[in-house]
């Protein structure tokens, strides 16, 4: 057996051996392996962190939408309570002072109190004192184009997309090595390095929402640019006044129709016909949608029909005096329901976001225009004989003022805010909740007993309100249409012949590809 050949000087003392370089090289390889392992573990941890952050962010965005919906529902329920108390006070006033036009005019004119905000609220005064529109005409032209694009967008998301966290992949640059290997590495100064985050946040900006990116590149002073940014998202006082001028007539006619119906017809008939505002809102919102929550679905239609059926049962349980129905009062009720639906659908289409419109300023101008433009109606109604002008006594006047401040000024502001937070259909269906609540108030305060029809009708009214809320919350989910499609697909299904695994002749190729290739080669 031949011994292995040894290198010269191998194993001798005082002579350089070749084993230390091999050890250094193996140590270097092991260090590289440990570094790769450390980087792999770090990448895995980053991916876990990214998953957790994205999950939390999606939950937060869903929580924000749920919080808006919950706040809107609470506000609408509070409005129902206020309206029930207001209706009780209105019934007392009509027993002593049956003047629908005067009552509606007085309550609507109280909206002028909101215009005191120009004295108290500084941003409102700045819109009048500062010439922003003349000074920055081009800027506001871009802003109007931006908001016009927003108005045509039917989606709820009018800002940046939800953040997405992605790990950053740094490309390692080749390290600079010294030319001479004899230079001592300990004497070379260490270069200072900057640590960057290993996770980057990505947000996408829609093309029609790119005004903010243009504002960030403008050369205005910081304070001036900040003030413009605060006011550009809001409608100016002139624009709010124009919107109020149009909607003041619709709102006044809707309330006047309801008051006239109450004076001509029984309350039960008025409430039954007024509940059709939900149906008018559903139809108008489908024709003139303001957002994705106003899309027409079959489930919403059935919920509205369910609500109307419940209202009919509730009113039948509350009163049996239905023999003296007046046709004029029924027409007034239907007109009021239709005008109320036009009012809420058109204003949501005109103003797509609640932060774009100053709701107190809007109602303030509504009261101002009603006070300035509709006072000739007293002379017209007085000389035609429809309603004689008569000033009320102190008690009735105090009741009208209290009812106007709480039941009209405050409640209309809260109701419109709740409609912006939820949807126009939910806001109109919330009106139907006042009927069972008013009957409950009569049971508690006046000790009135109702039949089983009341309870049979109150349950559908409450259920329809919360059903539509859930349908709008879950992105216009239409379970009724889904069920109909599945039933139709089940009935119209075709019996298909399924392949049996044991039938080998069905899987056998009729033309052998190998034989075909051989014939092509021979030819």
Curated annotation (Swiss-Prot):
Domain EamA intervals: 252-316
Main localization (coarse): membrane
GO cellular component: membrane
Its membrane topology: Multi-pass membrane protein
Keyword Membrane in record: yes
Modified residues (Phosphoserine): 207
Annotated transmembrane regions: 69-89, 101-121, 243-263, 268-288, 296-316, 327-347, 361-381, 395-415, 420-440, 452-472
Keywords per UniProt: Membrane, Phosphoprotein, Transmembrane, Transmembrane helix, Transport
UniProt-annotated location(s): Membrane
Biological role: Putative solute transporter.
PANTHER family assigned to the protein according to its UniProt record, in alphabetical order: SOLUTE CARRIER FAMILY 35 MEMBER F5 (PTHR23051:SF0), SOLUTE CARRIER FAMILY 35, MEMBER F5 (PTHR23051)
Family: Belongs to the SLC35F solute transporter family.
Protein name: Solute carrier family 35 member F5
Species whose genome carries this gene: Pongo abelii (Sumatran orangutan)
């Amino acid at each position: 057996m031949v011994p292995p050949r040894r290198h010269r000087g191998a194993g001798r003392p005082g002579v350089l051996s070749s084993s230390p370089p091999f050890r250094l090289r193996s140590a270097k390889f092991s260090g590289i392996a440990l570094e790769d392992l450390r980087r792999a573990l770090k990448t895995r941890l980053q991916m876990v962190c990214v998953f957790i952050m994205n999950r939390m962010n999606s939950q937060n965005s869903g929580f924000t939408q749920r919080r808006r919906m919950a706040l809107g529902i609470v506000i609408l329920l509070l409005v129902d309570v206020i309206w029930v108390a207001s209706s009780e006070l209105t019934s007392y006033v009509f027993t002593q002072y049956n003047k629908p036009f005067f009552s509606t005019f007085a309550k609507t004119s109280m909206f002028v109190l909101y215009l005191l905000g120009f004295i108290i609220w500084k941003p409102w005064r700045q819109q009048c004192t500062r010439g922003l529109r003349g000074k920055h005409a081009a800027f506001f032209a871009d802003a109007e184009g931006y908001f016009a694009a927003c108005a045509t967008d039917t989606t709820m998301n009018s800002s940046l997309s939800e953040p997405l966290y992605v790990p950053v992949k740094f490309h390692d640059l080749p390290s600079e090595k010294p030319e001479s290997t004899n230079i001592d590495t300990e004497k070379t100064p260490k270069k200072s390095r900057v640590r960057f985050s290993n996770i980057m946040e990505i947000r996408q900006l829609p093309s029609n929402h790119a005004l903010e990116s243009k504002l960030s590149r403008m050369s205005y002073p910081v304070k001036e640019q900040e003030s413009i940014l605060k006011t550009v998202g809001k409608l100016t006082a002139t624009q709010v006044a124009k919107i109020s001028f149009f909607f003041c007539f619709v709102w006044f006619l809707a309330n006047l129709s309801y008051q006239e119906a109450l004076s001509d017809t029984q309350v039960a008939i008025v409430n039954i016909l007024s509940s059709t505002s939900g149906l008018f809102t559903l139809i108008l919102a489908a024709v003139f949608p303001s957002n994705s929550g106003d899309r027409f679905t079959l489930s919403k239609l059935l919920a509205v029909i369910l609500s109307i059926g419940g209202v009919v049962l509730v009113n039948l349980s509350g009163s049996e005096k239905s023999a003296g129905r007046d046709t004029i009062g029924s027409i007034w009720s239907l007109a009021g329901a239709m005008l109320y639906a036009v009012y809420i659908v058109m204003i949501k289409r005109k103003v797509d976001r609640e932060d774009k419109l100053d709701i107190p300023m809007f109602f303030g101008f509504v009261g101002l225009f009603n006070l300035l433009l509709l006072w000739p109606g007293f002379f017209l109604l007085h000389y035609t004989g429809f309603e004689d002008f008569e000033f009320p006594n102190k008690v009735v006047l105090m009741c009208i003022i209290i009812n106007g401040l709480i039941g009209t000024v405050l409640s209309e502001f809260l109701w419109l805010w709740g409609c912006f937070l939820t949807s126009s259909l939910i806001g109109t269906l919330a009106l139907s909740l006042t009927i069972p609540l008013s009957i409950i108030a009569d049971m508690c305060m006046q000790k009135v007993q109702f039949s089983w029809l009341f309870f049979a009708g109150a349950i559908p009214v409450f259920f329809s309100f919360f059903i539509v809320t859930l349908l709008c919350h879950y992105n216009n989910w239409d379970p009724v249409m889904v069920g109909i499609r599945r039933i139709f697909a089940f009935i119209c299904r075709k019996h298909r012949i399924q392949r049996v695994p044991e039938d080998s002749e069905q899987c056998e190729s009729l033309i052998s590809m190998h034989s075909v290739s051989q014939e092509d080669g021979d030819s």
